[in-house]
Amino acid sequence: MMAGCGETDHSINMLPTNRKANESCSNTAPSLTVPECAICLQTCVHPVSLPCKHVFCYLCVKGASWLGKRCALCRQEIPEDFLDRPTLLSPELKAASRGNGEYAWYYEGRNGWWQYDERTSRELEDAFSKGKKSTEMLIAGFLYVADLENMVQYRRNEHGRRRKIKRDIIDIPKKGVAGLRLDCDANTVNLARESSADGADSVPAQSGASVQSSSVRPLTSVDGQLTSPATPSPDVGTSLEDSFAHLQLGGDSIAERSHRGEGEEEHESPSSGRVPAPDTSIEETESDASSDSEDVSALVAQHSLTQQRLLVPNPSQTVSDRSVAAGGIVSVRSRRPDGQCTVTEV
């Protein structure tokens, strides 16, 4: 009984100790379990969580988004507004902006200065304390050169684009840390990020009419006149009719002669406005008609041929009139004994 009570008392006395141990573990867990970045293979600086729940450094995610806009592990797409509104795992931004020492390193931005992240600041301070003229920094997957004599930074493979840097006290007004704004709660508009991985400012997207609607079809120019593609130009229609007139010239003349009768002269009325054909054409037509009238069998055959030619439509305004008026071309019609017509141009 005593042993049992002693064991029971011992187990009871151990409970607070275990509870205290659990409490101490829970309190020290955030400081011990610092997430590691799978991109830079170091402990995360300003860790952020993507929608896929993978954790990286903010600058590492920024560099990866410029290259592929996908998660480095699962290849899930990174949202467009993630860099403007990242999901920080710990509210350490303002504490990081205060720093641990008296001085901090800054790089130039629009209307203000950005503070370097802690890791890059340590590298710059170490190079500055050793009296180096320059040092290289790996930021968001890009190699940058910090010129400590001229106090500028630039990409190692792009010397033309330079940004001023400075070493100043920790309490100066600043925009944020490594591209993370201190006023994250402020209302921000959708911004078009420029191609800068070191925490550069964003450029507002131009809301002008730079993108035109592609639903409106452009106007086409025909003979110096703007016309819609759906509306044919009258000049184009006239030229098509003129070219088509040469093909139907023989058929229209045959239909007109069938109305007048065989052997009748083809003098046109003044209202038609057609240029009369040369005398050679009339003489050939009359001689052929007289020879056909002497042969009765030929007349019967010609009459049947005329009945077939009556089926050819005769428009209200013959296209031959427009062809003669527009081009000034006089065609000579002649009829062969076999009833076929030929068209020759003079």
UniProtKB/Swiss-Prot annotation:
Domain of life, source organism: Eukaryota
GO-annotated molecular function: poly-ADP-D-ribose binding; ubiquitin protein ligase activity; ubiquitin-protein transferase activity; zinc ion binding
E.C. number(s) listed in UniProt: 2.3.2.27
Pathway where this protein functions: Protein modification; protein ubiquitination
Bias (Low complexity) ranges: 202-216
Transferase among keywords: yes
Reaction(s) catalysed (UniProt annotation): S-ubiquitinyl-[E2 ubiquitin-conjugating enzyme]-L-cysteine + [acceptor protein]-L-lysine = [E2 ubiquitin-conjugating enzyme]-L-cysteine + N(6)-ubiquitinyl-[acceptor protein]-L-lysine
Residue ranges, annotated region (Disordered): 195-240, 256-301
Composition-biased stretches (Acidic residues): 281-295
Transmembrane segments: none
Keyword presence, Transferase: yes
GO biological process: positive regulation of canonical Wnt signaling pathway; protein autoubiquitination; protein K48-linked ubiquitination; ubiquitin-dependent protein catabolic process; Wnt signaling pathway
Domain WWE: 91-167
GO CC annotation, single: nucleus
UniProt PTM: Ubiquitinated; autoubiquitinated. Autoubiquitination is enhanced upon poly(ADP-ribose)-binding.
Locations listed in the record: Cytoplasm, Cytosol
Function of the molecule: E3 ubiquitin-protein ligase that specifically binds poly-ADP-ribosylated proteins and mediates their ubiquitination and subsequent degradation. Acts as an activator of the Wnt signaling pathway by mediating the ubiquitination of poly-ADP-ribosylated AXIN1 and AXIN2, 2 key components of the beta-catenin destruction complex. Acts in cooperation with tankyrase proteins (TNKS and TNKS2), which mediate poly-ADP-ribosylation of target proteins AXIN1, AXIN2, BLZF1, CASC3, TNKS and TNKS2.
The record's note on its domains: The WWE domain mediates non-covalent poly(ADP-ribose)-binding.
Subunit structure: Interacts with poly-ADP-ribosylated AXIN1, AXIN2, BLZF1 and CASC3.
Full protein name: E3 ubiquitin-protein ligase RNF146-A
Protein species of origin: Bos taurus
Gene: RNF146A
